[in-house]
């Protein structure tokens, strides 16, 4: 499979899955939380915040993007990428990475303040909405909501609040970095599986990937903004302002930064496993035919 096909056909769908994940995450490190009680609080934080739910949606989201038939993408390549993703994006190892980073980044007070917000009626409603939006099944509903926004664009105040949420949670930047890592991992993995005489030199490959990124980053950025509008569509401006007040508080800032860093670490680890698994998976699927 050529690099151009990967970049043109396959990754726009996977970019949708990555954006779906990225916008659902909210992202000063002091004395780290430690001990059994602190570990229990971190686990509760991961559940109450929806981070654990989001991590569990990564593999289904990746598979939905990969397995959607695309012109020019052979069935054997989709099968190989699906196998590699299944190996790489298992939730268990990813959760261990997230848990370790969150435990080292947040102190007891920051965890307590964050749980206080998450356990509030508004915090619980927001988490439920974010969880729903992070599931692969939501993609069709989000696309339908995009048409609704075309007919009735959001008010300026709502658009400004969504922009603030994007910046406060780090959703857009996280999605962009994940997308770049994902494109490069797949390109390197597929390239490594080619016969030696057909492989693209590493520096040329990276230049080709870099050239493809502006369009994909723009696409992902638009999807993140749309996803945020969809996620918070049932909330008033005042409720979103309350959410922003938490995110801008010292503990909210610490939580958001820790969440983004933890998720980025887990995704980069998984992308590395994905890249390493692709050549063997492609070899396994050689000769498979189909659309």
Roles of regions detected by a PLM:
Residues 135-233:
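Extended amphipathic alpha-helical interaction segments
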Residues 33-68, 155-184:
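Immediate post-signal-peptide N-terminus of mature secreted/exported proteins
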Residues 26-32:
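Sec/Tat signal peptide C-region and signal peptidase I cleavage site
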Residues 13-26:
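Bacterial N-terminal signal peptides
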Residues 84, 88-174, 180:
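Acidic/His-rich structured neighborhood in mature extracellular/periplasmic domains
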Residues 2-16:
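Bacterial N-terminal signal peptides that target proteins for export
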Residues 56-92:
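N-terminal, post-signal-peptide region of Sec/Tat-exported proteins
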Residues 214-291:
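A cross-kingdom marker for long, charged
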């Amino acid at each position: 499979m050529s690099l151009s096909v990967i970049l043109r056909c396959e990754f726009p769908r996977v970019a949708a899955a990555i954006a779906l994940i990225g916008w659902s995450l909210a992202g000063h490190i002091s004395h780290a939380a430690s001990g059994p009680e602190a570990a229990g609080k971190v686990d509760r934080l991961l559940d109450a915040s929806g981070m654990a739910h989001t991590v569990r949606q990564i593999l289904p989201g990746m598979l939905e993007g990969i397995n959607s038939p695309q012109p020019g993408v052979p069935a054997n390549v989709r099968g190989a990428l699906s196998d590699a993703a299944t190996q790489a994006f298992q939730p268990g190892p990813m959760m261990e990475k997230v848990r370790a980073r969150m435990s080292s980044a947040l102190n007891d007070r920051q965890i307590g303040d964050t749980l206080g917000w998450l356990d509030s009626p508004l915090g619980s409603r927001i988490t439920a909405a974010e969880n729903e939006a992070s599931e692969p099944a939501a993609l069709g509903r989000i696309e339908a909501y995009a048409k609704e926004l075309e007919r009735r664009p959001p008010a300026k105040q709502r658009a400004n609040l969504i922009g603030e949420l994007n910046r406060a949670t780090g959703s857009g930047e996280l999605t962009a970095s994940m997308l770049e890592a994902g494109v490069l991992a797949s390109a390197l993995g597929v390239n490594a599986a080619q016969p030696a005489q057909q492989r693209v030199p590493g520096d040329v490959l990276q230049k080709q990937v870099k050239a493809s990124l502006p369009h994909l980053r723009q696409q992902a950025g638009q999807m993140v903004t749309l996803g945020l509008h969809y996620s918070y569509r049932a909330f008033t401006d005042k409720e979103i302002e309350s959410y922003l007040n938490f995110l801008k508080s010292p503990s909210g800032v610490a939580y958001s930064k820790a969440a983004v860093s933890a998720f980025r670490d887990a995704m980069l680890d998984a992308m590395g496993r994905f890249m390493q698994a692709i050549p063997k998976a492609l070899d396994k699927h050689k000769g498979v035919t189909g659309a």
